[in-house]
């Protein structure tokens, strides 16, 4: 990544990644139920609402096909943003987590997020060193979160990191840390 900024832990990295991506109070964020609680907690800390979609059998990560189906049935684009038709809440981000280092179908998520005007925030806490089609995980969205907790691939006993190739995001990250 062009920039990497350390923070206190992976939950904090997810929280700040969501904040940088424009998630606000009352928004909905799509993620997966098969994950560490930090993913849903980071969404909740912003007073946003986690929406759970199913995982793929082959990756054990969030299924872009299940997300697409859910969006087609429950969402609409209004004024350049995605909204839940039944709750009227803005759907501002999708957070796939690369379970046990198995990358989700990232090319599908990139297309889906562009089409539905939703930010892609990768939870790459379990996939440091993993590749998807020759590219490291954590580099497909504008921002990604890593964790160095004791049960992760690389550990410092704790700590997290935000990575981004987007210069606007990476410059803004420092403002949140300071």
What are these model-predicted stretches?
Residues 13-18, 39, 160:
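Buried hydrophobic packing segments
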Residues 1-10:
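Conserved N-terminal alpha-helix of the aminotransferase class I/II PLP-enzyme fold
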């Amino acid at each position: 990544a062009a920039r990497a900024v350390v923070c206190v832990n992976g939950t904090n990295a997810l929280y700040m990644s969501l904040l940088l991506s424009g998630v606000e109070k009352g928004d909905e964020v799509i993620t997966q139920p098969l994950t560490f609680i930090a993913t849903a907690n980071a969404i909740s800390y912003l007073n946003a609402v986690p929406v759970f979609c199913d995982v793929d059998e082959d990756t054990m990560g969030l299924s872009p096909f299940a997300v697409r189906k859910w969006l087609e049935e429950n969402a609409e684009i209004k004024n350049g943003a995605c909204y839940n038709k039944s709750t009227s809440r803005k759907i501002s981000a999708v957070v796939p987590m690369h379970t046990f280092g198995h990358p989700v179908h990232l090319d599908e998520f990139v297309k889906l997020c562009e089409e539905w005007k939703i930010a892609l925030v990768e939870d790459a806490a379990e996939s440091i060193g993993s590749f998807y089609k020759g590219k490291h995980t954590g580099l497909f969205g504008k921002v990604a979160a890593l964790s160095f907790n004791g049960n992760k691939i690389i550990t410092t006993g704790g700590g997290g990191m935000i990575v981004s190739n987007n210069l606007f995001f990476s410059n803004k990250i420092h403002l949140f840390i300071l």
